[in-house]
């Protein structure tokens, strides 16, 4: 019975990321794309772990990755290294985050409230 509800949940979440399936950038702030590009640039220059966003802060650079979690950018970098553009890797990262958070919330609610959740 849980598989049926899980599939219903996944079908209901499709409209959530329908704008992300179109070409180009959808309406959002572009700092995720900028940070993914800076993370890609930092790794391509041979820095590990990546800490410095060289083009941030009006070109002076900022230690963005010291203070902001790097995990989403590592996941996006997997898609980037597989040959996708930066915009597409950010979109896939967002879609993956939406789907995984919905599935995790489903199982968490099920654990607390049983079949009512």
PLM segments and residue spans:
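Active-site lumenal/periplasmic loops and adjacent helix-entry segments of GT-C-fold
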Residues: 15-113, 117
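Start-transfer (signal-anchor) and selected internal transmembrane alpha helices
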Residues: 1-19
């Amino acid at each position: 019975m849980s598989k049926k509800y899980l599939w219903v949940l996944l079908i209901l979440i499709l409209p959530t990321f329908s704008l992300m399936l179109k070409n180009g950038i959808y309406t959002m702030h572009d700092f995720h794309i900028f940070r993914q590009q800076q993370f890609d640039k930092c790794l391509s220059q041979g820095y590990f772990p990546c800490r410095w966003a060289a083009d941030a802060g009006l070109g002076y650079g900022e230690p963005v990755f010291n203070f902001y979690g790097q995990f989403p950018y590592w996941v996006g970098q997997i898609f980037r290294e597989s040959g996708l553009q930066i915009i597409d890797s950010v979109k896939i990262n967002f879609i993956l985050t939406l789907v995984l958070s919905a599935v995790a919330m489903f199982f968490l609610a099920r654990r607390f409230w049983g079949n009512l959740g």
